Amino acid sequence: MPDEPTGSADPLTSTEEAGGAGEPNAPAPPRRLRMLLSVAVVVLTLDIVTKVVAVQLLPPGQPVSIIGDTVTWTLVRNSGAAFSMATGYTWVLTLIATGVVVGIFWMGRRLVSPWWALGLGMILGGAMGNLVDRFFRAPGPLRGHVVDFLSVGWWPVFNVADPSVVGGAILLVILSIFGFDFDTVGRRHADGDTVGRRKADG
């Protein structure tokens, strides 16, 4: 009798191989972490450089016109949060920002979504930019005042870090509303599955 075909394979092995073959382009988490860090470095660098230039060139508290009185360079020292909110709680804001930075690094280990990498990178870069001021500017560590220098209309004076943090947060809210998770590629189904691909942990 002819030998029986030996092409059959263990079902579990076949399933795993098929799953692996179906995800040849699934981005590995380290790749997205690198993207997150790259965005953060760009934001942080822009924030630090523009603050140094502002401190060197702008007279404190005296607006320098860019577009009439609507858009001006105005150098101020801010003890509060983004856009001069919560002044007087400098050390609390410093601790919160530090916690945000730690949390983003923790999420970055499992990050798969490129859009989440962009949003988290914007928040990380902005948070670190203002933390540099909190730790290294007067009146002292944890109490340092943040340098703000751009005024637009009635909006409080701000710096590069502020719109980066707010813009990144808005992006993450939009992604969450539309069902995009940080550790998936694609959208969630109503039952919790994803339309895209979920990268296995580890």
Curated annotation (Swiss-Prot):
It is found in: Cell membrane. NCBIfam families: lspA. This is Lipoprotein signal peptidase. It comes from Mycobacterium tuberculosis (strain ATCC 25618 / H37Rv). GO terms for molecular function: aspartic-type endopeptidase activity; endopeptidase activity. Residues 1-29 are annotated as: Disordered. HAMAP family: LspA. Pathway: Protein modification; lipoprotein biosynthesis (signal peptide cleavage). GO terms for biological process: protein modification process; proteolysis. Keywords: Aspartyl protease, Cell membrane, Hydrolase, Membrane, Protease, Transmembrane, Transmembrane helix. Belongs to the peptidase A8 family.
